């Protein structure tokens, strides 16, 4: 075939130029498969085949692609005929060598947007796959506008465009690139302080950090959220590589001349500050926006925490040439270029709402909103883009200046569960998909019917740094109330800090829950708050806030932090306590969810209850209790703790306990 000969010639040219390209095959399954095999036979290479079905040799499922990151391949096939795993697509593109093709298999072009996408099961919170017309139309626009991509459609004439030759490219030899060499020189002579290196993926920041460690005269310690992500760094650091996990490093008295923190923006800020203060020199590296990179706006705020920071950026790719067509196309398709916050939105702010249909009529507006929201966030995944475009129940507000988006709010519908399902969630018998706050209100709260109420959760909110402290965030929340009808509440879940809580409090929210362990992403306890919109919403917020006040002393003692509520010193078991204790004793409610009422039970009961008292009053570890009580593990310890709670309840009032047990055990019969 003449087209295969032309592709063979073009592939050789691409290898000389150090670039990769996308080739789309769109058509019926048989046609796509036949033409892919012809390409594979004509162009020598690895031909890694990413598909949910094992259609060919060298197959890998999208979910297993993570295991191949760090390896390199020549040519690959990405089968998106039944579902488009955007994160896997982005990750695959990063594994391809210079001179490679990424062959993208798509359904018949005209039928694509109406076809259910199997990948939607991961992000839509729907029981069945849904069609994703807005993402498909966006991708079609990108593909048809990209002069460097090749689109080969069934029953359409195929023509290979002439590509203007580029300058020859010379692959890296392992020695530092000129950009790295210059940066290394500056780091080697840096006075005591903190340096930050940011870069997109594939720019060699891990190699740079490893080369620094190998060259310094003194000792360095490496830390990171996950040791697996430091493999490249370790390779370049050689025998001087020494890794210690962040929490273990903080607990130790280790000293070194340099601390190197890989993917520093993913480490909770309070923990990072404590670590940095211990070492004379620190190098922080972070991936900027891209495949699960960090938003540039978040980085501005992050870097501002370190006065006199030396900030550097690597821009030159290492494994392919600058301006690689595949990298450019993937970035445009998955909107990896977030808001860079270089332009200040001017003029008065106007709040307006929009829905997902705007992706069809005016795609630039939701695109800018997404870029602002992802730019302000510490991490954005391609799943977020897919959810914003096509998941049901998504709503948006923008705060527009004269020429730029100054702020944005993303809301998600929640709640409205049936009475039976809400009760089953409260008891711990069921955990349906989605409904983050609505389910938590039931699963961790007092009211078994909490999830029947209908709310709208704040998923993300952002204001341009140059327009902050003008009340724009509060205007967005007020706008959400104005544009929202027939709901019981707005809700928000966030990593608790005093500054964040003051913002939500000024917006009118009521604190209803505080978690009992720190989140890995923020280093903070999770807080949940409600802004009531109906009488039922107001009653729920008041009831849960009252429970939080009763539990405040117990939570403060457990967490080691005072709660921002007025605590109630009330040791008497209430009706709500009895119900919740029965939920722990006879259903599957978690131990720490019931911390407050269990401590009140222990104060009331005269029984020994060693498993409960040991954990909650004496703060013994699970391992210690299992040894003392001769139990085989945590599961058996929890069974014993539930049995002890039941014994204590029966001893206080056997009739009431039996009635509650019978009532709650009925809730697991829900189908």
UniProtKB/Swiss-Prot annotation:
Transmembrane segments: none annotated. InterPro entries: Acyl_CoA_acyltransferase, GNAT_dom, NAT10/TcmA_helicase, P-loop_NTPase, TmcA/NAT10/Kre33, TmcA_C_sf, TmcA_N, TmcA_tRNA_bind. Residues 356-531 form the N-acetyltransferase domain. One of its GO terms (molecular function) is tRNA binding. Changing residue 291 to A: Loss of ATPase activity, but no change in tRNA-binding. ATP binds at residues 180, 202-211, 319. Changing residue 460 to A: Loss of tRNA-binding. Its EC number is 2.3.1.193, 2.3.1.-. ATP/GTP hydrolysis is stimulated by the addition of acetyl-CoA and tRNA(Met). Binding of acetyl-CoA to TmcA activates both ATPase and tRNA-binding activities. ATP promotes the 2-hydroxyisobutyryltransferase activity. GO terms for biological process: rRNA acetylation involved in maturation of SSU-rRNA; tRNA acetylation; tRNA wobble cytosine modification. Changing residue 471 to A: Does not affect hydroxyisobutyrylation activity. The keyword Transmembrane helix does not apply. The keyword Protease does not apply. Gene3D superfamilies: 3.40.50.11040, 3.40.630.30, P-loop containing nucleotide triphosphate hydrolases (3.40.50.300), tRNA(Met) cytidine acetyltransferase, tail domain (1.20.120.890). Changing residue 327 to A: Loss of ATPase activity, but no change in tRNA-binding. It catalyses: cytidine(34) in elongator tRNA(Met) + acetyl-CoA + ATP + H2O = N(4)-acetylcytidine(34) in elongator tRNA(Met) + ADP + phosphate + CoA + H(+); 2-hydroxyisobutanoyl-CoA + L-lysyl-[protein] = N(6)-(2-hydroxyisobutanoyl)-L-lysyl-[protein] + CoA + H(+). The record marks 502 as: Important for lysine 2-hydroxyisobutyryltransferase activity. GO terms for cellular component: cytoplasm. It holds the Pfam family TmcA_N. PANTHER family: N-ACETYLTRANSFERASE 10 (PTHR10925), RNA CYTIDINE ACETYLTRANSFERASE (PTHR10925:SF5). This is tRNA(Met) cytidine acetyltransferase TmcA. It comes from Escherichia coli (strain K12). The gene is tmcA.
